[in-house]
Amino acid sequence: MDDNPTAVKLDQGGNQAPQGRGRRCLPKALGYITGDMKEFANWLKDKPQALQFVDWVLRGISQVVFVSNPISGILILVGLLVQNPWCALNGCVGTVVSTLTALLLSQDRSAITAGLQGYNATLVGILMAIYSDKGNYFWWLLFPVSAMSMTCPVFSSALNSVLSKWDLPVFTLPFNMALSMYLSATGHYNPFFPSTLITPVTSVPNVTWPDLSALQLLKSLPVGVGQIYGCDNPWTGGIFLGAILLSSPLMCLHAAIGSLLGIIAGLSLSAPFEDIYAGLWGFNSSLACIAIGGTFMALTWQTHLLALACALFTAYLGASMSHVMAVVGLPSGTWPFCLATLLFLLLTTKNPNIYKMPISKVTYPEENRIFYLQSRKRTVQGPL
């Protein structure tokens, strides 16, 4: 026979090699833009300072949802522009001013480059614009936004010096402190910077269960994620979920689950449907679910269940704090998320599967789990 089987195999292998290389190149390329984009950060180290600063600002915008990824920051910025360009502008101004202030105060450079000195001011700028009673494009508002953004690195540094003793993050406590201070100092009747009037509930809400809309409930899931940035547009919430997904699929999953649990909590307390549809029950629980479900605790099925419990607890705490703080005319912000999640992180247990990540090692859930498994392996092999 003239046929050479060996030659045929070699020929087939030669034709398949480029396809195999293509399949290998795709995951490698995705590796450069997913996670925390560490390779990109290393590449920027010898580049112009202005380019590095843009990277820090974009990471700061995305750090609100525990993501340190400039591309995710761009996507989130796009989502903010879809929602309201004025809010997006205030958020950017806050992030830039806060990052510059941290540089002037000689704060930890690694925290600045990771965006950890910008994210609180992102929320400060956005929420100050939302609660302003002057409406959009009241340009004088940029002055108090800049002033309050300058306080964020101060609050962060002070809180970190205390919380670091327990190896705890500051979360969005600086944002809550800055926003509460500003709104309580100005109020609804301030002649220069009036804020939206917030009043406690004084009557029984009209909740008619047959009017409950399944479509609106479905929309409220991405809206709950969007409300982390004060956005009530479902498309914006979807963009935010995409930005989180780019960095970490596990974070995206927990963000969606947390928002869903917030909806369930709202329905269980017969909350006004308008509040549930607007995502007001979902954003704190979404943040809590992300934080416990793999970010500040290594992801196991035990910590996954703990994240679900924390999300529900946060939603109910949010309802409680909203009623209490409305008495003094203030929003609850992300106080419920901060307090509930810090409480869960202080949990002590002898279960090795509930592993709290050292703050210095926290990145994103997939990488955190690898660190946890390696640490556990070293612990097992240590005595040998």
Curated annotation (Swiss-Prot):
* Effect after changing T334V: Nearly abolishes urea channel activity
Q: Which controlled-vocabulary keywords does the entry list?
A: Cell membrane, Glycoprotein, Membrane, Transmembrane, Transmembrane helix, Transport
Q: How does it sit in the membrane?
A: Multi-pass membrane protein
Q: How is its activity regulated?
A: The rate of urea conduction is increased by hypotonic stress.
InterPro entries on file: Ammonium/urea_transptr, Urea_transporter
Localization terms from the record: Cell membrane; Basolateral cell membrane
Stretch list, region Disordered:
1-22
User: Which Gene Ontology BP terms does the record give?
Assistant: establishment of localization in cell; urea transmembrane transport
Question: Which reactions does this protein catalyse?
Answer: urea(in) = urea(out)
Transmembrane region(s): 61-81, 85-105, 111-131, 138-158, 237-257, 279-299, 305-325, 327-347
Single Gene Ontology MF annotation: water transmembrane transporter activity
Which residues get glycosylated? N206
Gene Ontology cellular-component annotations: basolateral plasma membrane; plasma membrane
Q: Where is this site: Important for channel permeability?
A: T334
Subunit structure of this entry? Homotrimer; each subunit contains a pore through which urea permeates. Identified in a complex with STOM.
Job description of the protein: Mediates the transport of urea driven by a concentration gradient across the cell membrane. Mediates the transport of urea across the cell membranes of erythrocytes and the renal inner medullary collecting duct which is critical to the urinary concentrating mechanism. Facilitates water transport in erythrocytes.
Give the family from UniProt: Belongs to the urea transporter family.
User: Can you say what this protein is called?
Assistant: Urea transporter 1
Record the organism.
Bos taurus (Bovine)
The gene coding this protein: SLC14A1
